[in-house]
Swiss-Prot record:
SUPFAM superfamilies: PurM C-terminal domain-like, PurM N-terminal domain-like. It comes from Bacillus cereus (strain B4264). The keyword Magnesium applies. Part of the phosphoribosylformylglycinamidine synthase complex involved in the purines biosynthetic pathway. Catalyzes the ATP-dependent conversion of formylglycinamide ribonucleotide (FGAR) and glutamine to yield formylglycinamidine ribonucleotide (FGAM) and glutamate. The FGAM synthase complex is composed of three subunits. PurQ produces an ammonia molecule by converting glutamine to glutamate. PurL transfers the ammonia molecule to FGAR to form FGAM in an ATP-dependent manner. This is Phosphoribosylformylglycinamidine synthase subunit PurL.
Length: 739
């Protein structure tokens, strides 16, 4: 579309063209007031994309302010490309998680691939080398052909991008529930390492300094991607394929190396990824954060399509692009550096003092807008919140234990539920050993990556049981953070901080906004108690299809520090004769459990409860015992309860089983999902020291029989299961469903 055809300011107002771009009548009036005139077409586009929920968090900011974001190790909290946490020895870990849900629903391969590419850029734009990727995925039930297609393509897209770029995908989670059928969730997390002096910010300081565009050229892909991410999916969403970007991992690999070399140069002033809202957000945010303005000449933007308008160039979300500010007079060095990698680096503007974002094209001024108005002055909405109607009903239910006839058959059925079953089909497609720093590969409680040149490691995980959060958002929010920390501790790490990805339905519905508020309350409380501040994250709203919202899914990405790699602990049994301990009491808690869903086909009632002080005490005891060398294996008890946790520890070992005695009512003892529990094995000679250090109950021992046998307190056998048969069922479940 050429400039001739763009509607003029009067038409934009009278024909309400701004509404098609996502601005409300009130918002358009605010823009008019800020500018003191009617905006032109390009300016309307700038505001519509920067004031979208995706870029401005206008509906979620009041809630996000509840998160604790500071701590003695936090070097950078929310507000930059990614958060940064000190890990000692002048080193720091940089990490962030983001969603790419809407694009993945309509173009799953590219949607997932570019989600990975975008989160990697957020990390290296801080000056860090990306060392690991994780992902948290949600799909409908695998019986559906459409879900199979989405699942296969999303995994292929993640693998395709991560493997080509040479960053290991080391962990994550995949869960399946009917509510995600029309709206899958694809959350990608990247972890990087940095030395303190290399930390860079996305800020445009120094009037007269040069603004440069580096990386891939700009096309028409992804225009209004941020706006598309801020509305519900519908039948017409298929037509929005152009709003899905296309990724090139080989280009990004070169971009990483070039940018990491650039960061060592004193010519660099600021650097930011062109992510959501492309050139608009990177320029407006860099100027606003520095209290400056930016002037840009759009004729100089490298374009891969002809006749692009200023509107299209500013709103394109083409991938693999960065905006940088360099010291005046040093431009040629930058051009030479990028040329070495076969990449473009083009001067396209300068930093100004007047705090305006000013755009020129073909000799004319095409936009003049205050940078702060775009980046900081979006309206903030305090949405009405109303307790969901189902909540009181679920809370009032008397908890019933599901009826189980045959414990062994039930255990086998649980091991084959896709949410519990082995995800080997997924992670076998990922290169998780590239860079050769992966110490604990996918499949244990958390992945561990070596910090090169030290004896330290980084433990990392993503967690969120959205069924619990649906039943009780506040309790479920606490559990999500606690389970992530439990996974880090079981791997020998000290939990440091979290990044979050808040996936919810339409915030304009009061019951959805209530879910958001309550789950953030629960997460915030858990973060404070467990001392894991939130250092950044992402909000993804409008995850609905035909009015049906997904379960509230605030995914937690957590990183922990393994002080010495000899503390690294995994979930599988190590040797026959070791003693098996259970930490934590089991109650008949089945609300939102795998057993409840399997037997009743739906979830209802109260979610499991959690006491965060008890959780903290147990985590500290377990971590200290691991660091003291008293623990052989550690596994958190999660979906499927104790029977599944013990079976998983046996399945991961070779030729080992266990004989265990569990007290209490059999179904609860085996399958309840009470929180703050661990299965730990200990060498016989460490029995006394371990029991002194940790409040735990010895329930049995590891055997060389290749069988798991569980007795009740009367010593009657509840079940005996062959480990090879369990492994076959557990590993075969997902491939079998995909056939």
């Amino acid at each position: 579309m050429s400039l001739m055809l763009e509607p003029n300011p009067t038409q934009i107002k009278e024909e309400r063209i701004y509404a098609e771009m996502g601005l409300t009548d009130e918002e358009f009036a605010m823009v008019e007031k800020i500018l003191g005139r009617l905006p032109n077409y390009t300016e309307t586009g700038l505001f519509s994309v920067m004031w979208s929920e995706h870029c401005s968090y206008k509906n979620s900011k009041p809630v996000l302010r509840k998160f604790p974001t500071t701590g003695e190790r936090v070097l950078q909290g929310p507000g930059e490309g990614a958060g940064i946490v000190d890990i000692g020895d002048n080193q720091a870990v940089v990490f962030k998680m983001e969603s790419h849900n809407h694009p993945s629903a309509i173009e799953p391969y590219q949607g997932a691939a570019t989600g990975v590419g975008g989160i990697i850029r957020d990390v290296f734009s801080m000056g860090a080398r990306p060392v690991a990727l994780l992902n948290s995925l949600r799909f409908g039930e695998l019986q559906s052909p459409r879900v199979k297609y989405l699942f296969e393509e999303v995994v292929a897209g993640i693998a395709g991008y991560g493997n080509c770029i040479g960053i290991p995908t080391v962990g994550g989670e995949v869960q399946f529930d009917p509510c995600y059928e029309g709206n899958p969730l694809v959350n990608a997390m990247c972890v990087g390492l940095i030395n303190h002096e290399d930390i860079k910010k996305g800020q445009a300081h120094g009037a007269g300094n040069t603004v440069m565009y580096v990386g891939a050229s700009t096309g028409r892909d992804g225009i209004h991607g941020a706006t598309f991410a801020s509305e519900e999916l519908s039948e017409s969403s298929e037509a929005k394929r152009p709003a899905v970007q296309v990724g090139d991992p080989f280009m990004e690999k070169l971009l990483i190396e070039a940018c990491l070399e650039l960061i060592q140069s004193d010519a660099l002033v600021g650097i930011q990824d062109m992510g959501a809202a492309g050139l608009t957000s990177s320029s407006a945010e860099m100027a606003s954060k520095a209290g400056m303005g930016i002037e840009m000449y759009l004729d100089d933007v490298p374009q891969r399509e002809t006749g692009m308008t200023p509107y299209e160039m500013m709103l394109s979300e083409s991938q693999e692009r960065m905006l940088i500010v360099v010291k005046k007079g040093r431009e040629q060095e930058i051009v030479d550096l990028f040329e070495k990698y076969g990449l473009a680096a083009v001067t396209m503007g300068k930093v100004t003092e007047d705090k305006m974002l000013r755009l020129f094209h073909k000799g004319e001024k095409v936009a003049e807008v205050p940078a702060d108005a775009l980046a900081e002055e979006a309206p903030i909405y305090h949405k009405p919140s109303k307790e969901a109607a189902y909540f009181a009903e679920f809370q009032a239910m008397k908890m019933e234990t599901p009826k189980v006839e045959n414990y062994k058959e039930t255990l086998f059925a649980l091991l084959q539920q896709p949410t519990i079953a082995s995800k080997e089909w997924v992670y076998d497609q990922y290169d998780y050993q590239v860079r050769t720093s992966t110490v604990v590969t996918p499949g244990s409680d958390a992945a561990v990556v070596r910090v090169r040149g030290t004896e330290k490691g980084l433990a990392m995980t993503t967690d969120c049981n959205s069924r619990y959060i649906y039943l009780d958002p506040e309790m479920g929010g606490k559990i999500a953070v606690a389970e992530a920390a439990r996974n880090i501790v079981c791997s020998g790490g000290e939990p440091l901080a979290i990044t979050d990805c808040l996936n919810f339905g339409n915030p304009e519905k009061p019951e959805i906004f209530w879910q958001i508020e309550k789950s953030v309350d629960g997460m915030s409380e858990a973060c404070r108690t467990l001392q894991t501040p939130v250092i950044g994250g992402n909000v993804s709203m409008y995850n609905e299809r035909s009015g049906e919202a997904v379960y509230p899914t605030p995914t937690v990405g957590m990183v922990g520090l393994v002080h010495d790699l000899k503390h690294v602990t995994t979930q599988e049994f190590k040797q026959a004769g070791d003693l098996v301990y259970v930490i934590g009491e089991t109650k008949a808690e089945f609300g939102g459990s795998e057993l409840q869903k399997m037997i009743h086909g739906k979830i209802f009632g109260q979610s499991p409860s959690i006491d965060l002080d008890v959780e903290l005490k147990r985590q500290k005891q377990v971590l200290e015992a691991i660091q003291a060398g008293l623990v052989q294996s550690a596994h958190d008890v999660a979906e499927g309860g104790l029977a599944v946790a013990i079976s998983e520890s046996a399945i991961g070992a070779k030729g080992l089983g266990a004989t265990v005695k569990l007290d209490g009512e059999a179904t609860a003892a085996l399958f309840a999902e009470s929180q703050s529990r661990f299965v730990i094995t200990v060498k016989r000679e460490n029995k006394e020291a371990f029991e002194k250090a940790v409040e735990a109950i010895q329930v049995g021992e590891v055997t060389s029989t290749n069988e798991v046998t569980i007795h009740n307190e009367e010593n009657e056998v509840l079940l005996t299961a062959n480990v090879d048969e369990m492994r076959k069922a557990w590993k075969g479940a997902i491939p079998c469903l995909l056939k």
